[in-house]
Every structure is written in C-alpha cells, then in structure tokens.
Amino acid sequence: MEKLVIATRRSQLALWQSEYVKSRLLEHYPNMQIELQEFVTKGDKILDVPLAKIGGKGLFTKELEVAMLEGSAHLAVHSLKDVPTQFEDGLMLAAVTKRFDPRDAFLSNKYTSLEELPKGAIVGTTSLRRRMALKILRPDIELKDLRGNINTRIAKLNAGEYDAIILAATGIQKLGIENEVKYFSPISTDIMIPSMGQATLGIETTNDPKVLEILKVLNDNNAHIESTVERSFVDTLQGGCQVPIGVKATILDENSIRVQAIVGMPDGSEYISEDITADIEDYETIGQNLAQIFIDQGAKELLEKAEKVAFK
C-alpha cells in the first residue's frame, strides 16, 4: 500500500497519539504516505453532561468507525480504555501498543496528595470508577463533575474551581504539562485501580488483510496479554466504558500475571474487589474466570444498581 489514512479525534492528546502511531509506522515503512483524518465524536461534543448520563458505548469511537466502514480511513487510533469490548461487524482490534503509565494522577495547587486533603475538599472527576475509589478512600470529600479536554480541566483547577482533580497520568505525561500545576502525583494502582486498557493505544481497522499485515508491527506482546485479560473481565461482566469497573493486569515475570479488579457503587457504599496471581499461559481465560468469581458474589446486580444511579 502506498497510502494509509488514520482516523483520529481532534483533541490535542488524540492527535499526539495518532502522530505517535504514524511515526512508529514510518520507522518500518519509510516510503509510505500516511495522512491523519480528524473527527469530532459525540463524546467530544457533549461537555455539559457527565458521560455516564449520556449512556451507550463508543462515545469516542463511533464516528471513526463509520469512516473506516465507508472506506475513507484505513485505521483508527483510540485510547484503548474508550474502545468497547464488542465491535461492529467488519471491524476489529488489530494491535495494542506498548503501555505507557497506567496510573491515575492527583493534581492540585494546594495539597500534595489525597491523604492531605481536608474534610470537605472539592475534587473534580466525572469517571464513576474514580468516584467509587475516591469515596472508598476519602468518604469525607466532596466530588464535583469535571468535563472537557485535559487543558480545559487543568484550567478549571487553576481557576480555583476545585481543590484537586484526578486525571489519567499518561495524558499529562504525553503532553508534557506536569508543571502546569503545583502538585502532580500518580496514584498507586493498589489504591486506585485503572480502567481496562488504560495507557494503551488500541488500533482498530477493518478486516482488510493488507492493512492487518502492516499494523502487526505496532503490537506489543505484553500489552496484548494484559489488555486481553482486562477486556475479557469487563466483557464477561457486560460492563461498558461508563460503569464503575477497575481492572489492571500486570505481568510479573515470564510465568505469572497479577490482576487487580474492583466493581461497585459510584458512592463507594458497596463494592467487590479481588487481587489475584495466575499463570500467564492462561491469559486468554483469566479475565473471564475472575469475572465469574465476581458474578458469583453479585457483581452483575451491583452493576445494574450502579447504572440506575448513574443514569438518573
């Protein structure tokens, strides 16, 4: 193929990620012409309503998928955490890139950490998963919705609307804006378990064999194993991108993999959590088996309850 078109969202972070993928491809195919085709997704347009209340899956991927199915783009670059576990007919996950920093991060101009926040402090986040974790850790703080791109969210913090905000560490690090706030502190996954696929890029495409062959060079085996476990866990629970589920698989060595997972209510009042170590050779079934342990403890009923609360 002489020309490859990458569908991407228009945000600064999405463009960084697509340029990163473009540069990786050019390392292997220096003579290939690669273009970016920019889109504004439904999730980008609706900034005054928490994502959980919008509902549905693929809020940040649908428009890019349409472009691929219609033939105007060959692939799309997504934050893997935004990619639903089930694909439209004719589409598939072709590769997952090397994982960046998977942790969430604490940002503040007043306090160095979650522990230092005073009672009643206002913390900005819209993610139901982060809300759940924060309320489990600090039931005495106040949570306030936070939408917009990374720069908008930091601007709101700097304007004094929040005492602290929680964002994905990788986005801040990719854009090199850690110093735009006084305190930037990644949070251990032992305290706040990330979303499935967090800090990994998912490369989606059609089943065109020529394109699939080209995209093989982007796949990172460790990220593939970890994200397979995480996505299988969420898929078995039938949880979308906007419900309070955290899951993080971490390869420990050539034989074993650790999986941390949590499911619960957005207010932290009820939750189920597990932290297991399994044989890495079973990575294709670990997520499903762990999800079944959660289901046996009432996870599906808990998620249904959480969804009703979130969509009110």
Swiss-Prot record:
PANTHER family: PORPHOBILINOGEN DEAMINASE
NCBIfam families found in the cross-reference section: hemC (TIGR00212)
Described function: Tetrapolymerization of the monopyrrole PBG into the hydroxymethylbilane pre-uroporphyrinogen in several discrete steps.
SUPFAM superfamilies: Periplasmic binding protein-like II (SSF53850), Porphobilinogen deaminase (hydroxymethylbilane synthase), C-terminal domain (SSF54782)
Keyword Phosphoprotein applies: no
Gene3D superfamilies per UniProt: Periplasmic binding protein-like II (3.40.190.10), Porphobilinogen deaminase, C-terminal domain (3.30.160.40)
Gene: hemC
Organism from which the protein derives: Aliarcobacter butzleri (strain RM4018) (Arcobacter butzleri)
Pathway: Porphyrin-containing compound metabolism; protoporphyrin-IX biosynthesis; coproporphyrinogen-III from 5-aminolevulinate: step 2/4
GO biological process: protoporphyrinogen IX biosynthetic process
Protein's name according to its UniProt entry: Porphobilinogen deaminase
GO CC annotations on file: cytoplasm
Note: The porphobilinogen subunits are added to the dipyrromethane group.
Names of the cofactor(s): dipyrromethane
Family: Belongs to the HMBS family.
Lineage: Bacteria, Pseudomonadati, Campylobacterota, Epsilonproteobacteria, Campylobacterales
Keywords linked to the UniProt accession: Porphyrin biosynthesis, Transferase
